[in-house]
């Protein structure tokens, strides 16, 4: 059975394309594609593997299984899907949920168990500054990020989610 991603509308595709262009031009020392190890659900892994095969992208053993599954890194520590020349994601249309939701990230409230959303600080992510300053873009992106983050949280087992939530992200602040 062929796995399919939820349909995105043209406005969503345009917004993601604009974000992609901003990220590609990013010159900060921090890189979302360097050493971040985004979690991959079983469903997303199948989708990415199908995409790699369909597009004839020669990446063998694209994933690592430790406490959770994430994309393999190249010898420089970048995500194997990050094209070092173009600074683009070669699987942009099917990239991991947390990559789609960026610069929004998440944690869970230890008391309520509910997902809480955070945004990266502009000093490490120019896109975060653009998104946060434009309330309309922020709201649209929050809606998209909530869906993606809910999808990844629902798609991970408890052990994997616990491992991900241990990762410290000090350069963020909570969005109400």
Predicted segment positions?
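Short loop/turn segments that flank or connect secondary-structure elements
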Residues: 1-176
